[in-house]
Amino acid sequence: VYATPFACGLLRRKLSETGLERRVPITEVPTGGGFSVKPFSVDFIPLAHSVPETQALVIETPAGRVLHASDWKLDPEPLLGPVTDEEGLRAAGQKGLVAMMCDSTNVFVDGHTGSEGPLRESLADVVAAQTGRVVITMFASNVARMESGIKAAVANGRSVCLVGRSLFRIAEIARECGYLQDCPEFVDSRDVGHLSRENVLILATGSQGEDRAALARIAQGDHRDITLQGGDTVIFSSREIPGNERSIGRVQNALAKQGVRIITERDEFVHVSGHPSRDELRTLYGWVKPPLLVPIHGESRHLLEHRRFAEENGVPATAMAENGQVMRLAPGPAEVIDHVPSGRLGVDGNRLVPAGGEVLRARKRI
């Protein structure tokens, strides 16, 4: 595995939790760096995204050069890390590409995705307007948002408590990589009950309503240290991922029954996406001028719309593949030529079974 320092830190920690750290060789590559695995060579181009050190990949092959840009946005004030490297992307296009793979997440969204900079100010203002205990839930991997939540607490005289194992893990790795350096030490969740409700802010996992995440346990009254009551507030600093509406709704209903105020991106400016909207996609097409676009990172309707949108905006050719399909990009026109096994696997004793297979379906029914 080749990755930037932050991703390597996450991977090493996950592997160590399962006893696999010695079985997976990991090579750390600096942001903007590169590596070779013959017959391929790969160069990194820094991109702004909600996860630190996100990189586009310029993959050199004997058949041509491919640009893979999965998660990115054009954020003038990303807060952690550099802005998206326009010069590097232009240079990749000028060298000549066979194809570009590109993020499709926000292809239905007009305009330009918001910036983390103004969001930080807004989040502090929203917290300032609350009088009771405040919980902010977010994607744990969004270190810039975590830092914004911490700074919102500090600006309003509140101590910060992290609740959720993934938040602790990512905060530790972020600090090891040089992030979150100006943030205070966190309060242990066991000590929250000794603090005045208006003097604490809790960062919690579970923005998507995950059953065993911290926020769901707090909402159900199952958390051993954290309780909420009327006058408290939960801020969802995240988007509602399609398919998670019911689980998020269950958590929000449980909170509402306790008299907790719920604030989402529909109510206040508390979230921005980490993915490009239509104006940014147009800009990238102009910088790179890809001869062929392969839309990635989205459901079928996103990929199909991105294909249509790219053709409408001057990209000469597009192609689309589904998970497990093998696509030949060159020589000749792009086409699917094979299939490989894909999808999630579950561990059943000492064997791997398909996550959607009969074994796991039967256990869920039981």
Language-model regions, residue ranges each:
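C-terminal regulatory/interaction regions
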Residues: 151, 155, 174-366
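His/Asp/Glu-rich metal-coordinating catalytic cores
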Residues: 1-195, 213-227, 246-249
